[in-house]
Amino acid sequence: VATGGSIPKVSHLKEHDELLWQVLDDGLQGPFEIVNVDAHSDLAMFTGQLDIGNFISKMVDLGLVDRTLWVKDKGSMDFMDGFYNFAIGRTGEGLRLGSSLSVPFYFLNEDYAPRNALITSRELALTVVTDLSKPVFSDAKWILSIDYDYFGCRNPQAKDLEEMIKMIGAETISTLYTKGSTIRTLVEWQEFRNDIDRMAPGVFTAICRCLLPSFTYSTEEIMGKVVELSSFIHKSRDINNCLGIYLIDSVGSGFTDSAKHAEIDKCVKAWIDRLRYP
């Protein structure tokens, strides 16, 4: 079992949902913080089946995680930068979890549930940051999770998005995304969705399904991102409190470009060696 003060173990996983099983196999005891370097937040609610987008909520439900620092790319979506405190718990629909955070990300998949509707409840403190020039301090026990799609992300639904752009135009999609991002109540969200469906039936669901982050970087830019991330982590967290480091390929799921994987892997592992043995 890894404990504060020891050299953290490094686990290399194919997909992000494997992290939960690896943490349990490592015998880590919660609660701890997960520092998630990722193109996606991975904070969707557990529906009864574990997947690459909802494993963190299940870790919260199990009492393993009580804090999340999401380090995101400027092209990422899901949440705006800032601090969020909310509850995650059972909704009464089987093993399904709900979130008390009133934001579009949770309205979209019907994951939102007010606190008084949750049968069980665990608190999560979420910090979202894009600009890594200023450290975000914490003395909590933590694990570091690095998804390689942070250094270059593909959209598996890119072809569908292209068709949608041809149909209604990129400007319309951008306007709808900007407007939707500002909504903070479920009633407003439902009205927003109904207005779009009246304008063009089925368009709302289609846009939401294919509107995913997509960005690419040159080798020099990837190295620059690693250097920037290295500085941020060194200033923000104590490596002696790190319980484990998890590297995620995300090639099979289609989010990390297989052509870029080798150089991303090389850059990240070179930094991780320096992080573990300063």
Q: PLM features: residue spans?
A:
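Conserved alpha-helical scaffold segments that buttress catalytic/binding sites
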Residues: 1-278
